[in-house]
Structures are given as C-alpha cells and as structure tokens.
C-alpha cells in the first residue's frame, strides 16, 4: 500500500496505479480494492476496512433540488449523484449486492458535501411521498434504502496517514510530502506511517532528522545581576 498525507495525493496515486494495472484510465472493475470511508451498518462494513469488488453492474443517477450557498446567498440548484451497482463481501464474507457512490470514489475530498448529503435525503423523500417523516415506517425505509445507504469508499491502493491507522502491511510505500517538518503533528504522522510496514518500507521525500534538528542558537541576552 502507498501512504501519503492528503486525499488529493491519494487520489492521484490511485489513478496512476490503476492506469498501470489496466493500461488506461478505466472505470471501476471487478477485483478493484476499495477502502470504506464511512460506516455502513446495513452491510456491516466499517470505516477503514478494505474490501474487493466482486462484480460491477449498471450505473444510475439520482437527483434532487437543494438550496445552496452560492456567492453569499442561497440559490436553488439541482444536485445529481452517480451510483454504481456492485457486489462486495459483507462483514461475514458473504457476497452482497449494493450501490456505491461513484462521485466520492474519484474525488479529491474526504467525503461528500453537506449539500450532497442533503440531496440524498431529499431524493429519498421524493421517491417515497407516501411515507411521513418522524414515523417508524419512514425510519425503516431510510435505513434500508440502497441509494441513501450507498457505500462511501475510495480506491484502496493508496491511503492517507489518517486512514492507515491500525493497519499493517508487508510492504509499504510512504510519501512524506506535506509532512516533512519537525513540528509535533508532522512527527506523529511520520511515526504512524512509518510503523505500518511489517517487513519492507520504501520512502519518498523522507524528512531529514538528526540529533541536532531541533538545536537552536539563541542570541546572547543580558542576565540579571547575580547577588
């Protein structure tokens, strides 16, 4: 696995790796690896899990109007989200057909926007006009809706340091770009990423840290009189 600092870098690495694997910029296909980015209780898949794509089916779209902040004022826009029918193993390893939110899969962002989340909810309400909100039937239908509960995932060939926590791999490639400083956050990130390798570690843009990295020479200052 490749570990890097930003979602933008991870997305770029994933795109390049898939081009090398498949000979071009191809859509999601069978045997691709996904990294779950949000708990999906319907399938028992947790944030940070890696799952293989067992099969890929048809693509579909769902739309809804929302009021979004544009240029400092609210405007009514229509948001369209793209979905792919896929089969992945559930928490017990059994194949489960479900929907995957394609917009997030190749996005530089960590998650979908508030407006996109709102569009998912409004779209559900539009598809179920007979259900009243704040009822058990509404909650049950929402819990089992394939679009509202679509898998939110990224390609799992390259991940951020945040997402790699708790995982270990035999071979790990770490790109320290964006985390080469000596501040506490950078050092913690570097430690976490570096220690994910069980056997072999490959590095890029490694921070230059020596025993004197934090050594500083201060200007001579006048001391108070010593009695």
Ranges and model annotations:
Residues 1-225:
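Core RecA-like ATPase module of SF1/SF2 helicases and allied nucleic-acid translocases
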